Amino acid sequence: MTRIILILTATFFACALGASTGGSHPLRPWWNALRSSGRIVGGFEVPVEEVPFQVSLSGVGSSHFCGGSLLSERWVMTAGHCAASGQTNLQVRIGSSQHASGGQLIKVKKVNRHPKYDEVTTDYDFALLELEETVTFSDSCAPVKLPQKDAPVNEGTCLQVSGWGNTQNPSESSEVLRAAYVPAVSQKECHKAYLSFGGVTDRMVCAGFKEGGKDSCQGDSGGPLVHDNTLVGVVSWGYGCAQAGYPGVYARVASVRDWVKEVSGL
C-alpha cells in the first residue's frame, strides 16, 4: 500500500511540476510540421514491468516504427496510420524495455483498421491487430484495461504516455522505453489550438502542458496514453513535439468501444 501511495504522489507532482522538470503526408501540405508518428520528449526511462501492456510494432526483418497496447492474449491496439487493413509482414514485440530485443516476438495475423479512418483529418485513428500466437502473460507482459463506452477524460487528469520514439535529446537513447506524465487538456482548448489545422473531433483527446516540454513524438505513434491502468488514448498526431501551445493529440479509445467489441469481442 505504501508503494501505491508513493507512486500516486509522484505521478501527481510529475504533472503538477510541468515542463520545468524535465514522415511526410501526401494530402496535408503542413504534415511535415505535424508529427503523425509519435516519441517521448521530456520524459524518463521506465521498466516495461511498469507498463507491461506496451508493444513495439515493426515489419518482419525491419526496425520499430510504431507503438501499441496489448488488450488481451491475441489483440493489440495501435494507430490507424501505423497499419492498414490487409497489410502483411508485421510483428509485435511484447514484454521488453528494448524495442529490438527480448520479450516475445509475435507475427500479426490480421490488421483491422477502423473503417472510418480518415487520412486527411486523422479521425478514427485506430487499428486492431490480431496476433498469430497467444501471448504468455507475466510481470512484463499484461493487458491494459479498456475504458467504458464514451467515458469522459476530465481536464487536468494526469495521464502517462510511453514509447521508444525520438527524445529530441542526443544524450537520451530512444532504444530504451521511456514515459512522461501529461495533463489532459479540455476539448475546447485543444480545438482552439488546432483550429488552423482543422481542429479536433470527438474521436480525439488532448494532453500536454501549455508551456510544452513533455510529449510523445516520432516513433511513439500507436502507443498508449493511460490513466489508472486504463487505455485512454492512442498516440496520434500534433504540431511538432512538446511545442508550447500545442498539446499532443490522441485517438480517444472510449469513442470506439462498440467497434472494438465488434472486431475483437473485448
UniProtKB/Swiss-Prot annotation:
Classification via SMART domains: Tryp_SPc (SM00020)
Tissue: Midgut.
Keyword terms of this UniProt record: Digestion, Disulfide bond, Hydrolase, Protease, Secreted, Serine protease, Signal, Zymogen
GO terms classed as biological process: digestion; proteolysis
Gene Ontology MF term list: serine-type endopeptidase activity
SUPFAM superfamilies noted in UniProt: Trypsin-like serine proteases (SSF50494)
Propiece residues: 19-39
Pfam families: Trypsin (PF00089)
Superkingdom in the source lineage: Eukaryota
Residue ranges of domain Peptidase S1 in the record: 40-265
Keyword Hydrolase part of the UniProt annotation: yes
Site features described as Required for specificity, chain residue numbers: 215
Protein name: Trypsin 5G1
UniProt organism field: Aedes aegypti (Yellowfever mosquito)
